[in-house]
Each structure stands twice: as C-alpha cells, then as structure tokens.
C-alpha cells in the first residue's frame, strides 16, 4: 500500500521509520510482558491462583476468570492481562476446544475492562494524554463496559450448563518441582508488582510504557540471578530471564509486527483519515459515528482510528467535544470494545491469537457473535444512561 501511495522513496522511508518507532514500542512492551509472565510461570507462580480455583464447573470458572480479567485490565492494561490469562488458561484447561473458547471470552473481558480505565487500553491512554478524557471516564463507562461482557457470559452460560473441565497434567511443573515456595512467592509477587508498576511509571515520568515494562523485567532479572546464584547452570538457566526469553515464540512477535505494519501502511496512505472524514460527512450523529468506528476498529485497528478522530475534532469548552464529553467517552468505549469483533481487531486479541494459535475463521464462528451482542448492548446502555 505504501508503494502504491507514494512514488517518492524518501517519503516511504520517512513513513516506515515513523511507524517502526511506534510499533517498536508495542513490540518491546509485548516482549517484556511475555518474558515476565514466562518467568513467573517457570517458578510455578500461577499455582498461587490455580490452586485456589477448585471448581471444575465450566460456567462458574468462566465467570470467575472473566471477572478477574475485567478488573485486571483496568489496572494492568488489556494487552498485559490477556497475556497473563493466556498463560493461566493453559494451566486450568486440558481440552483444546474449551481452551480456545475460554481464551476468546477472555479477549472480550480484557477489552471491556480496558475501555473504562484511562490506562486500560492504548486508545484510552491516547485520549487521556491528549486531554480528551480524565478519571471521570471511570463512572461514565464502567457500567456499559460491564454490560459488554455480562451479556455474552449470560448467553454462553446456557451453552455450558452442566459441563465440566479437565485440568491438564503439567509436565513443566514436574521438571521444576524443586522450586521452593519462597522463591515461587517472591517471583510471583514481584512479577505482579512489576506489571502494576508500568502504569504508575507512565503516569509519573510521562515516558513510554515499554520503558517501565523493561525496567520491571530488568529488576526481576537481578532478583532471579541473586536467589538462584548457588544452583547449577542447567537448573538456573530455566529460572532466569535468558531462559525465559528462549521460550518465547518469535513467531508471535513477528505476527504482531506484521499486523501493525499493515495497519500503518493504511494510515500512511491516508485511507484511515479519509474514512474518518467520510463518516463525519455522511453520518454526523456522534453515537452512530462512534459505533461505526467500533466496527471499523475490528478490521483496521483502533489506534489510528482514534488518532484520526482526535485530529478531526478539537476540544471545546462545552458540548459533546468538551473534556469528558459524550463524544470522547463513547469513543473510548466503542474503540476499546469494538476490536473484539475480530481476533485481529485488538492488541489483546492479536497477542492471544499468537500465543494459543487461535484460527481467524474459528474466532469468527465461535466468538464474533458474542462480541457483537455485548458491544451493542453496552453501547445501548451508554446511550440510555
């Protein structure tokens, strides 16, 4: 698309450099988060959660995990939470079909949870930093966001009524059974605190989130080297950052990179900005515009769409375009949750797709309808409130 849109190679080079900077931040963030999660996993840290979840009832487990995901996303952000939940689900569910279905629901919950927090999604962070929204978005959007995940959960509760899940036998835990409890507790606690530190770091320093993530990873690296310094090299390697990095699949990162570059080419070609202008001219109604942006975000990614909307509309002192105005609040909801309609429509979806190898067509058949009814129900709730 870039080659078609620009005949001057200098412009192509400039645009590519611009997008690689933005995409690089997301990729480094993803690498840092995945490494921390893998480090916690290698120390059996997730057993602190999985051992407390005793139920094998599919419906009850779905509600428990969705609730955890919904609120974690508001604090950690939806991408990090989705990565954590993908690792957690593999510890809880043996059946491949059930694992993928639960993962699909977690994508919905992660995106719904991220939409009502200024730090829960990259688009809400953009709107927060840009001055379009403040912490007042929380009471305004939390109910529609909750409806967005509750409606699909009610629907699938009937489908999974009476069904149970089987726990997998984890070979990895057998190999690392000599990890003592205090090591597991330390790494789990520091891993969670490290992830929670990222939005705090962003708020205090105003530096990109990936720097906070890499700082947390660096701190964990030092800690693991200290607590495992007396162990033999083979055992120590599997419990430190170099070992965790070696277990991360490069295909996941490259897949993520390819998706973002494709979207960047559409943005550089002016296609996304043209679509935003057409929406404003043809529709006009702020609710319908945002609902349509939500649908588009499932295909074209929500970041450039929100960026385009921020460039099209100036902040006013009163009305729907004021700070915390209806347009910006509803944009945060629609852009955040609309991406759930397709697995490639959100960073959380793309990450889980890569980690668990979710098929694009499978997601459309099994999850997209649930995402649609939740998205529309939440939108209707916001409009009515």
Locate each region found by the language model.
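Helical membrane-embedded segments and adjacent short helical loop/helix-boundary regions
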Residues: 1, 13-48, 54-61, 182-188, ...
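Hydrophobic core segments of alpha-helical transmembrane domains in multi-pass membrane transport
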Residues: 1-7, 31-38, 69-70, 110, ...
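Membrane-interfacial helix-loop connectors
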Residues: 2-9, 20-21, 72-79, 83-109, ...
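Intrinsically disordered, low-complexity non-transmembrane regions of multi-pass membrane transporters
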Residues: 3, 10, 51, 55, ...
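Alpha-helical transmembrane segments
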Residues: 22-32, 136-153, 204-218, 288-289, ...
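Transmembrane helical segments that form the transport core of multi-pass membrane transport proteins
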Residues: 43, 65, 194, 198, ...
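Juxtamembrane and boundary regions of transmembrane helices in multi-pass small-molecule transporters
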Residues: 95-96, 100, 116-117, 126, ...
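Transmembrane helix-loop junctions at the membrane interface of multipass transporters and ion channels
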Residues: 124-134, 193-207, 383
């Amino acid at each position: 698309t870039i080659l078609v849109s620009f005949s001057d190679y200098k412009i192509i080079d400039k645009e590519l450099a611009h997008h690689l900077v933005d995409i690089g931040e997301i990729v480094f963030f993803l690498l840092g988060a995945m490494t921390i999660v893998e480090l916690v996993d290698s120390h059996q840290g997730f057993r602190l959660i999985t051992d407390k979840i005793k139920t094998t009832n599919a419906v009850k487990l779905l509600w428990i995990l969705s609730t955890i995901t919904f609120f974690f996303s508001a604090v950690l952000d939806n991408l990090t939470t989705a990565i954590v939940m993908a690792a957690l689900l593999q510890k809880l569910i043996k059946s491949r079909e059930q694992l993928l279905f639960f993962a699909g629901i977690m994508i919905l919950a992660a995106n719904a949870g991220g939409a009502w927090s200024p730090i829960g999604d990259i688009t809400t962070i953009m709107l927060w930093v840009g001055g379009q929204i403040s912490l007042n978005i929380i009471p305004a959007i939390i109910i529609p966001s909750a409806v967005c995940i509750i409606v699909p959960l009610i629907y699938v509760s009937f489908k999974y009524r009476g069904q149970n899940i089987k726990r997998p036998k984890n070979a990895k835990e057998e190999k690392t059974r000599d990890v003592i409890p205090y090591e597991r507790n330390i790494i789990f606690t520091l891993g969670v605190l490290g992830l929670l530190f990222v939005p705090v770091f962003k708020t205090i320093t105003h530096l990109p989130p990936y720097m906070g993530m890499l700082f947390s990873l660096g701190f964990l690296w030092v800690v693991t080297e200290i607590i495992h310094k007396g162990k033999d090299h083979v055992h120590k390697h599997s419990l430190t950052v170099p070992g965790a990095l070696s277990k991360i699949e490069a295909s996941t990162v490259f897949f993520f990179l390819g998706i973002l570059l494709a979207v960047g080419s559409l943005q550089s070609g002016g296609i996304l900005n043209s679509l935003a202008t057409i929406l404003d001219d043809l529709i006009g109604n702020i609710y319908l515009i945002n609902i349509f942006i939500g649908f588009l975000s499932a295909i074209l990614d929500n970041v450039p769409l929100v960026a385009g909307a921020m460039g099209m509309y100036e902040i006013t002192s009163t009305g729907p375009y004021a700070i915390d105005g209806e347009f910006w609040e509803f944009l945060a909801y629609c852009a955040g949750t609309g991406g759930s309609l397709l697995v490639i429509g959100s960073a959380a979806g793309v990450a889980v797709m890569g980690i668990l190898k979710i098929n694009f067509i499978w997601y459309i058949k099994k999850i997209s309808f649930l995402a649609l009814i939740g998205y529309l129900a939440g939108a209707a709730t916001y409009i009515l409130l």
